[in-house]
Each structure stands twice: as C-alpha cells, then as structure tokens.
Regions:
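Hydrophobic structural segments
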Residues: 1-107
C-alpha cells in the first residue's frame, strides 16, 4: 500500500468539520485506530489580488492571521476523493492542501 501525508491549512473554527470529513473518508486510519491527526498553530499570510473573493482580508492588502496546519496520513488511492471532500468544507477560496508521498511509515 502507498501512503501520503496531507498538510491542510485551515482556520481553527473549521477544525471539527475537517476532522469529521477526514474520518468519513478514512484519512487518519492507522492500524486499529482512526481519526489520527496532528495540528499546530501557525501564522498564515496572503494578499488578495484583483478578482479574489477572500474568506478574510481586503484586496491588495497583506493579511496575517492565525490558522492551523493539520497533518494526516491517507492511502494514495483515496487522495483525490479526500481532497475534493476537504475543498467542499474549506472556507478559503484557494485552500492550501499539500500531498507528500511517504516512503516509509510505521503502518
């Protein structure tokens, strides 16, 4: 089986719905455990450009906000479905979701 790690940046207000969505799509399933995620408080910056519809912030103004970086392991074959599900519940117009291949895991 091939696995990857997802990094998802999201406002803390949306953590619960993200956890539920990930669990519904079997992300974070490790052995005899499910809902295994890690999250960290981080600062995010962005500047909305012409035509953007930001969750927070104003056009041409650099924003700095607290957010969470969520990490979760998933099977590669479920990756596209998981990313689409996360995008549906994510408040950002352009969510940052990184998929990182894992060479070796404790699975």
């Amino acid at each position: 089986m091939n696995f990857c790690k997802l990094e998802i940046f999201i406002p803390e207000t949306h953590l619960k719905i993200l956890q539920e969505t990930l669990a519904e799509h079997d992300a974070g399933h490790i052995g005899k455990y499910d809902s295994c995620i890690s999250y960290y408080h981080v600062k995010g910056t962005w500047r909305p450009l012409e035509g953007a519809n930001p969750y927070k912030g104003e056009k041409d103004t650099l924003s700095v906000e607290d957010e969470l970086k969520v990490e979760v392991t998933c099977r590669v074959e479920n990756l596209d479905t998981i990313i689409e599900a996360v995008k549906k519940i994510h408040p950002y117009e352009e969510p940052v979701i990184n998929a990182i291949p894992l060479i070796r895991t404790g699975l």
